[in-house]
Curated annotation (Swiss-Prot):
HAMAP family: Ribosomal_uL1_B. Part of the 50S ribosomal subunit. One of its GO terms (molecular function) is rRNA binding. This is Large ribosomal subunit protein uL1. The keyword Iron does not apply. One of its GO terms (biological process) is translation. It comes from Geobacter metallireducens (strain ATCC 53774 / DSM 7210 / GS-15). One of its GO terms (cellular component) is cytosolic large ribosomal subunit. The gene is rplA. Keywords: Repressor, Ribonucleoprotein, Ribosomal protein, RNA-binding, rRNA-binding, Translation regulation, tRNA-binding. Binds directly to 23S rRNA. The L1 stalk is quite mobile in the ribosome, and is involved in E site tRNA release. Protein L1 is also a translational repressor protein, it controls the translation of the L11 operon by binding to its mRNA. The lineage of its organism: Bacteria, Pseudomonadati, Thermodesulfobacteriota, Desulfuromonadia, Geobacterales.
Length: 234
């Protein structure tokens, strides 16, 4: 049996799939079964009581995780003039306009998030079909189309996570690294859940948060006790 398969089976044996875990115990369990040689990302999947096929039940937004993501986020900004300088001063990795559009058209994607000033969206629109499928298209709903580029860059660098409900009514998002202390992962996860609650569509009826699952990149997943998670929200 390959080493990876053996480690996965050993990790799987440590998780009780038939129960729901209190938040802190669940986080500690996920940390304990992260077996990869690299620092695995801890990810959450939240199943919501919405039907995203209806426009009035779409859930989308962004949240700055209090403890970041544990990785260097490469930020690209489409801006000119004073806003170009503001973006550079805030720590943006790449700043430009038509020159960046040309690079992207040639297949360059060495960045993790893209921000644009509103006046640049006509230019950015030319590469919408390239950015959109990769989740990189600037969008005012998540704060990446803005004249306040300095703040947007700093938030992205600090660990801003964008979320969007998928067809099955599930939101997937990272909440940190397996090397994080359990308390830091807890704070990040609660910040995400709180943002999801605030983003609840008025058209959503019945139970909104139906299931919360937690896992690391390679490790097995487990279900969290929703009532315990909600009791810890501010």
């Amino acid at each position: 049996m390959p080493k990876t398969a053996k480690k996965h089976r050993e990790a799987l044996a440590k998780i009780d799939r038939s129960r729901t875990y209190p938040l802190v115990e669940g986080i500690e369990s996920v940390k304990s079964v992260a077996y990869a040689k690299f620092d695995e990302t801890v990810e959450v999947a939240v199943r919501l009581g919405v039907d995203p096929r209806h426009a009035d039940q779409m859930v989308r937004g962004a949240v700055v995780l209090p403890n970041g993501l544990g990785k260097d986020v490469r930020v690209l900004v489409f801006a000119k003039g004073e806003k170009e300088k503001e973006a550079r001063d805030a720590g943006a990795d790449h700043v430009g306009a038509e020159d960046l559009v040309a690079k992207i058209q040639e297949g360059w994607f060495d960045f993790d998030t893209a921000i644009a000033t509103p006046d640049m969206m006509g230019v950015v629109g030319k590469i919408g079909k390239l950015l959109g499928p990769r989740g990189l298209m600037p969008n005012p709903k998540v704060g990446t189309v803005t004249f306040d580029v300095g703040r947007a860059v700093k938030e992205s660098k600090a660990g801003k996570v964008e979320f969007r409900v998928e067809k099955a009514g599930i939101v997937h998002a990272p909440v940190g690294k397996a090397s994080f202390d359990a308390d830091k992962l807890k704070e990040n996860l609660l910040a995400l859940v709180e943002a999801l609650v605030k983003a609840k569509p008025s058209a959503a009826k019945g139970t909104y948060i139906k299931k919360i699952s937690l896992s690391s990149t390679m490790g097995p997943g487990l279900n969290l006790d929703i009532a315990d998670v909600q009791s810890k929200l501010v």
